Amino acid sequence: MAEKAKVVKVGPGGARGPRPKVENPGKIFMRIMRYVGETYTVAMVAVVVCIVVSVLATVQGTLFMQKLIDNYILPLLAEQSSDFSGLAAAIGRTAAFYVCGIIANFSQARIMAHVTQGTLKRLRDDLFTHMQTLPIQYFDRNAHGDIMSIYTNDTDTLRQMISQSIPQLFNSSIMVVSVLVSMIALSPLLTLVTLIMVGVMLLATKYLTGNSGKYFVAQQRDLGAVNGFIEEMMNGQKVVKVFCHEDEAIQQFNELNDALFESADKANRYANLGGPVNTQLGNLSYVLAAMIGGALALGGVGGLTLGKLASFLTFNRSLNMPISQISMQFNSVIMALAGGQRVFALMDEKPEIDEGQVKLVNAKRLADDSITETDERTNLWAWKRVNADGTADYRELKGDIVFEDVDFGYYPEKIVLHDVNLYGRPGQKIAFVGSTGAGKTTITNLINRFYDIQKGAIHYDGIDITHIRKSDLRASLGIVLQDTHLFTGTVLENIRYGRLTATDEECRAAAKLANADEFIRRLPEGNNTMLTGDGTNLSQGQRQLLAIARAAVADPPVLILDEATSSIDTRTERLVQQGMDGLMYGRTTFVIAHRLSTVRNSDCIMVLEQGRIIERGTHDELIAQKGKYYTLYTGNFAENS
């Protein structure tokens, strides 16, 4: 019998490792409460007042039972009196207390609903704002579905904690204190019996919540893994079907789902035991108090009357209920702390370091041929450096890119680029060729500082790019990435993403330059056609054309074209190339392409192999050398010529 092939796991559900736990739960709890308190201090004070009023109303109602029996019912029965005026007045006062309690409960619920949603809004705002500052490496090493789970599942656990658990815990704590004081006043001896049972309930709660807590952390982790896998499979569904890997995908999902079931089952098994266990212990406490209290009342011991016993037993039940609620709410708090740990882990990720001081500004040329800053768009840009004395130096942006002895690795211990030296002068077209994994795309990612180098230097118009603010550096570059991404919005809005201040006419001109205008006119609503789901209603070639138009509308001095025409048919490529030639005129352009047409007319071709530049020169020079480029050209490139 043939051995079953091993399933290679490609999703985010790798090794699960040891069971995680909440680190510094007290610190996480205080961070959550700071989010609530900093914005809603007055509202939370109002909630506390409402809870106190509600508890006092409940306690007053229970104490009324003792007066009702001892002061009204028993005397009325003994005297055979028909005067119920005193009883009616007492009932009216108690009813007023209950009405106040109802109003307080209603007000508390309304206020907490507003506080909860406002706090979560602020939390999501801070999460998203911080996420925009994170380096690309963070998104490289974390599954996107797992990040989405932080925004949805983990923040939802905080919603339950803020809206329900925190008010209920405070309510129950106030209730326990108030009830205990009242019980001691009624019968210290019975209170001692009750406290012994309360101790047993607390021990049970500690055991159950301790076990459920560690599994809740695992549950949130496994839930993130499941979401990450689903998101990955949705994006790669065509690849799954092409290679007929549906069964393997189902098997991987089942493994992740089984892990989630295991952690969630154990977490909720312990959590759900808390309520029934404490309820039965509470019933036992009630029975013991009733038996002992009945004997004391019948014997007239300790001044315990029938009315006091009735009130005490009601308090006993009232005490058991908040303790059970505390047990149940602790589970929600522990789950929220597990979610909060993941939320704050994202918020504590170190933002992208940007120590640049040089800014990109609109400039104009003066009569003496010097340049200065202007608020108007002049199609002339300059790098602005502010000196210590407050004066500013301006250097015209030309698009001069120089690499000097650059080493780079995605991980410090694994260098993928070695001693890279290159330069691109204004108006030059530099092409990178080489086999897959040679480092072509990596070089372009270093120009826009998606990643920082380990050794060497990169200069832009003579300025070390680490001295230039990243936002200004990237604003000076027009980039068509290998992975085209379109946003939900109209065609025109997607083109305008290259420069948000661009007019409709400028966007249409950019589309025409990229030769995208022809297919846009054929769309149902032309430029106003809505694109959704990363432009799935367009072909891959059409999506690439829009990406090129988006780069064109930015009108940058430097272009980076990473596989820019790899998804366009030969006929469309010729049209695009005509537009791109006009766009590239006078600009430094770096091209990574597999098609001969985008490489052959380059001013300089760099051949990379295993992270090193092994050949450089024009097409004719490299062909004459009959080296690596000659092999590529006569092989792969010749097939596409």
Regions found by a protein language model. Name each.
Residues M30, A104, Q108, T116, ...:
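Hydrophobic alpha-helical transmembrane segments of ABC transporter permease domains
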Residues M1-T58, I73-G92, Q108-M112, T116, ...:
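Membrane-integrated ABC transporters
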Residues I136-Q137, N153-I162, I166, F170, ...:
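An intracellular "coupling" helix at the cytosolic face of ABC transporter transmembrane type-1 domains
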Residues L127, M131, V240, V343, ...:
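Helix-loop junctions and hydrophobic alpha-helical segments within the transmembrane domains
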Residues Q80, A363-S641:
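ABC-type nucleotide-binding domain
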Residues P75, S182-I196, K266, Y270-R342, ...:
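Helix-loop-helix
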Residues A43-L56, Q164-A218, M291-L304, M321:
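Transmembrane helices of ABC transporter permease
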Residues G17-P25, A57-I73, F97-H144, M148-T152, ...:
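Juxtamembrane helix-loop junctions of ABC transporter transmembrane domains
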